[in-house]
Amino acid sequence: MLNGMKAPLCVIAAIIAGAVVANAAEKAAGTGVGFKGPLGLQMYSLRFHTGTNALAKIDKARELGFRAIEGGAPRGMPAPEFLKMLEQRGMKLVSTGSDYARLKNDPDSVVAQAKALGAKYVMCSWIPHEKGKFSEKNAREAAQVFDAAGEKFRNAGITFTYHCHGYEFQPHGDGTLFDLIVQETKPEFVSFEIDVFWAAQGGADPAKLIEKHGSRFKLMHVKDLRRGAAINSTGTAPDEDSVAVGEGQINWPAVLKAAQAAGVEYYFIEDEAKNAVEQIPKSLRYLESLKF
């Protein structure tokens, strides 16, 4: 202490209390003894609650406890303005998205956009196809598009990921069409984001899927599927099939244990229900309570 003086007990107590508060503030929302994260929020979760107001979305995400997001700048808003809004709130954008057409026809513009946003990851969540008829041809064409775009991302220091959406888990040979996409893409160019809800809704076992493809999975959408929900290959489901994490049919200890063993780098809660802002706190509490 200054001048060799002993600090009064009240000062020591204050220092200890301050350290406890600081440590609590540093702990990411939703993490705990078992699940370590890091955990962010997919901003699509807030579409029913804040409309098109970008500032309201960011503030709601922060209010819910998140400091990292997956999303993008609103249409018409310059990336620097959006990033400033995040920075002022102690937040950051980790991952952003692109539609398939842009990846195929103008991947350079997607790279430029991702760099402007400071995104470490870019994900694509849909391959165009006739509803309910995703085919081997669709899968092989997508693999070529992903490899070509993925090389550009790799050269820019960005990781490209394809986000599964349920329709890819139709049988094909000894596996599925999702397996085909994995096999037909180069690991150095293409990684994957497992959406646990859509993997299960498409008929896959999410934990076994992660164990099968291991380090190809870099990101995860932490999202639960209602017990009794229909399983199909359409890639569509009612909003109410998205329930709070821990209240649905997913075996989360098995999934998250497999994900941590595989080296998944970032997790994002996504909740598609109309009452997502009520469900997300429940999801966070469940994740904090997990031990495995």
Language-model-detected regions and their locations in the chain:
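Bacterial N-terminal signal peptides
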Residues: C10-A19
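Acidic/histidine-rich catalytic cores of soluble enzymes
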Residues: N155-Q249
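Aromatic-rich peripheral "rim/lid" segments of glycoside hydrolase catalytic domains that contact
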Residues: S242-A244, A258, A262, A273-F292
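Hydrophobic faces of well-ordered beta-strands that scaffold small-molecule active sites
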Residues: G37-Q42, I69-G71, L93-S98, V122-C124, ...
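Active-site acidic/histidine proton-transfer and metal-coordination neighborhood
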Residues: E26, D59, R67-A68, R75, ...
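Active-site beta-loop-alpha junctions enriched in small/polar residues
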Residues: Y44-L46, G72-P74, S98-A101, I127-H129, ...
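N-terminal pre-domain/capping segments
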Residues: N23-Y121, S215, R285, S289-F292
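Bacterial N-terminal signal peptides that target proteins for export
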Residues: M1-V11
